């Protein structure tokens, strides 16, 4: 049927689904035109798939139940940039095979909508499309927008410690019912602006809209990475090691040296996570998860508060272990004399260097220690 009607045809060596524009041997053109009229109505409101199927069942069309879903799927493929499918009122940016299987059995659960954007609204879509590097049509833009936010970690979706605009944009996208309404009405309202009407384009309004939207989206995108850095610096500060990546590397070096000598059953697993992980990032994620008893990407605001409370407890244990650890304990009497002489020599050299920043001194010593460790590692 699809080939005979011309809906599926070969174009330049490739088979494609195309819209019908002239009479065909199968008499599908009137059906296609009725589907176009039904789906591309005067409003953006979705219309019932069951209602569409009932309409096409009746004279003068008389399309059988088995053919109806096939025609609908072809129609949505041909007009994929201008149509949307809904399941129980929820937008399906990218319908799956499972969705279509349900539609075959329960068409009453689904609705469909279509729109052709022109005028000022088209300029808005084109601006989105340039930023997302996608086709200048509503559905491709909305798909990228929703996919980007849905891919963010659980923490970003659950925290309320973000700006008002970021919270509103997140909720608006999550509850989107219509792609057209999302772009031209719901998102502007979420950003405390008037909806975009299909009339003369107000460039200042457009710039303000995208400035607020981009700020909110950037904040959402950066929220979980920000949390990781915050957790790292909270822990380091409590341990008296400063802040930043260099200080974290210093902590990991200390953990390697300290772990074999620690007996505190609560602190030891934390030190082992820092000492035995493959890299600094993995070690950091593992340590934060241990302190809060949950991976940081899944933290709620309550988990963040729990982490803050526990940090001081673990840091106190760390400082006590560090203070009680005597590196010379494993050395012979002769080795102790040698190590003290070297330490005194280094102390005098550092005094001559007149280093006033303790952070610089710690990092320098850490680098030297790492080089010495690397030199004595067995070569494979």
Residue ranges and their predicted role:
Residues 1-23, 78, 112-380:
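Long low-complexity, intrinsically disordered regions
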Residues 27-28, 46:
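Intrinsically disordered, low-complexity, polar/charged repeat-rich segments
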Residues 30-34, 53-93:
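Charge-enriched amphipathic alpha-helical scaffolds
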Residues 34-42:
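Solvent-exposed, amphipathic alpha-helical segments
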Residues 43-56:
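Short acidic, hydrophobic short linear motifs in intrinsically disordered regions
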Residues 64-70, 82-89, 100-108, 154-160, ...:
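Short, charged low-complexity intrinsically disordered segments located at boundaries
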Residues 84-131:
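C-terminal engagement modules used by replication, chromatin/transcription, nuclear envelope/ESCRT
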């Amino acid at each position: 049927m699809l080939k005979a009607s011309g809906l599926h045809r070969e174009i330049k060596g490739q088979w494609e689904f195309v819209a019908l524009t002239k009479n065909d041997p199968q008499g599908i053109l009137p059906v296609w035109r009725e589907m176009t009229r039904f789906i591309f109505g005067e409003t953006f409101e979705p219309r019932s798939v069951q209602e569409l199927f009932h309409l096409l069942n009746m004279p003068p069309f008389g399309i059988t139940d088995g053919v109806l879903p096939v025609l609908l799927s072809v129609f949505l493929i041909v007009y994929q940039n201008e149509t949307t499918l809904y399941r129980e009122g929820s937008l399906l940016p990218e319908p799956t095979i499972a969705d279509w299987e349900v539609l075959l059995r329960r068409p009453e659960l689904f609705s469909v909508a279509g729109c052709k954007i022109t005028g000022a609204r088209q300029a808005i879509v084109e601006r989105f499309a340039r930023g997302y590097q996608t086709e200048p049509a509503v559905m491709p833009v909305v798909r990228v927008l929703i996919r980007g936010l849905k891919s963010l970690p659980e923490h970003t979706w659950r925290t309320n410690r973000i700006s008002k605009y970021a919270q509103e944009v997140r909720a608006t996208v999550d509850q989107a019912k219509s792609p057209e309404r999302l772009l031209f009405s719901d998102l502007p309202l979420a950003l405390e602006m008037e909806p975009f009407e299909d009339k003369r384009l107000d460039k200042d309004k457009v710039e303000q809209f995208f400035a607020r939207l981009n700020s909110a989206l950037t904040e959402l995108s950066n929220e979980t990475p920000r949390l990781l850095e915050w957790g790292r610096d909270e822990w380091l500060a409590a341990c008296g090691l400063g802040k930043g990546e260099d200080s974290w590397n210093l902590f990991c070096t200390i953990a390697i040296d300290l772990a074999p000598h620690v007996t505190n059953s609560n602190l030891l697993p934390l030190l082992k996570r820092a000492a035995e992980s493959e890299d600094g990032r993995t070690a950091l994620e593992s340590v934060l998860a241990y302190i809060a008893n949950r991976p940081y990407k899944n933290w709620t605001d309550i988990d963040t508060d729990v982490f803050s409370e526990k940090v001081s407890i673990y840091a106190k244990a760390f400082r006590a272990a560090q203070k009680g650890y005597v590196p010379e304990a494993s050395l012979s009497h002769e080795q102790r004399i040698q190590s003290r002489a070297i330490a005194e020599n280094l102390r005098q050299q550092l005094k001559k260097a007149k280093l006033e920043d303790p952070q610089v001194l710690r990092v320098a010593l850490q680098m030297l220690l790492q080089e010495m460790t690397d030199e004595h590692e067995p070569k494979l």
